[in-house]
Design a protein with these regions (language model features):
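Soluble periplasmic/extracytoplasmic beta-strand elements of cell-envelope proteins
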Residues: 52-56, 76-80, 88-92, 108, ...
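N-terminal targeting leaders that route proteins to membranes or the secretory/organellar pathways
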Residues: 1-65, 71-72, 272-276
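C-terminal cap/linker of serine protease catalytic domains
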Residues: 32-33, 40-43, 104-128, 238-276
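Active-site region of chymotrypsin-like
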Residues: 49-51, 55-63, 157-163, 190-275
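Catalytic-histidine neighborhood of serine endopeptidases
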Residues: 82-146, 244
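A glycine-centered beta-loop-beta connector
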Residues: 82-87, 175, 231-237
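Serine endopeptidase catalytic core focused on the charge-relay Asp
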Residues: 129-201, 233-234, 243, 255
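A conserved glycine-rich beta-strand in the N-terminal activation segment of trypsin-fold
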Residues: 39-41, 62-92, 191-193, 228, ...
Length: 276
């Protein structure tokens, strides 16, 4: 009887320990990554962050006796090219996908130094309404999209000077340090550090199970609003475009998913063919 009691206690202790680790480990790891990669993060903030953009959708819908305008929470993108006053940026295709049950969609871009509506109000800006506020920002032109890679190339006009980033020459490898710069969960210009967690590319099916993406995993913390953002290596070159993330049972971030730079390069090659 005593032996059975000891075994039960041991099992309970093991399960409790596992539960504690499951709860706290996902919270500790990002903090460790941020602390150990402070210099890398500061380099991104100083020399690359102005290439980060926020993409906001305004959707218009008209009913029998009413009309409405909805403003999205926003997503991310990264500037990769400039021609005159026109900037070209990469993002995820699902970020700019247009809803079918609306009458009109307008997609605008905020540069890294442009304020969100709530931040503008907090700094004493005039309350002209959220839709009117975002309408003053440049509207995007969709240059090229691909369902098979969930990538999109967009462009917008601006007189401001923003950083233009390049694609990395080498494919990211398991254990490589990377940094994400994005606009997660209502925040702006957040840089997080992590590592590539894939030893090889793996296939991911979209929710419709119609499209498979060959992606890489990474541990840089992201959230809603990070879709379309850039993953950078220590040379501040783009090694991937972030698509989404995975959570555990406690809704804590576990890992991110990104399209690697070789597929991004192939995507841009397809675009070049369409304009040549």
């Amino acid at each position: 009887m005593q032996m059975k009691t000891k075994i039960k206690k041991t099992i309970i202790i093991i399960l409790a320990s596992f539960a504690i680790i499951s709860i706290f480990l996902p919270s500790i790891k990002p903090l460790y990554n941020q602390t150990m990669n402070r210099e890398f993060i500061e380099n991104v903030e100083s020399n690359a962050l102005s290439a980060n953009i926020k993409i906001v959708q305004l959707t218009y819908k008209t009913g029998v006796n009413s009309s409405s305008i909805a403003v999205s929470a926003g997503a991310s993108g990264v500037i990769i090219r400039k021609e005159g006053n026109r900037y070209f940026a990469l993002t995820a295709n699902h970020v700019i996908s247009v809803l079918e049950d609306v009458d009109k969609t307008q997609i605008v871009v905020l540069g890294y130094d442009d304020l969100d509506f709530k931040d503008s109000l907090n700094k004493g800006g005039e309350d002209i309404g959220i839709a009117n506020y975002y309408m003053k920002f440049p509207e995007i032109t969709v240059e090229y999209t691909s369902n098979k890679s969930d990538l999109a190339l967009i462009s917008f006009m601006s007189d401001k000077a923003y950083t233009v980033l390049s694609l990395a020459e080498d494919i990211p490898k398991y254990g490589d340090k990377i940094a994400s710069m994005s606009n997660p969960h209502g925040k702006r210009n957040i840089v997080t550090a992590g590592k590539i967690g894939s030893k090889k590319f793996w296939d991911y099916e979209d929710e419709s199970e119609k499209v498979k993406y060959s992606i890489i995993r990474h541990s840089a913390v992201t959230s809603e609003g990070s879709s379309g953002s850039a993953l950078l290596n220590e040379d501040l070159d783009i090694v991937g475009i972030h698509l989404g993330g995975n959570e555990n049972l406690f809704h804590q971030y576990v890992s991110g998913m990104a399209i690697p730079n070789d597929q991004v390069r192939a995507f841009l090659g397809e675009w070049i063919k369409t304009i040549s």
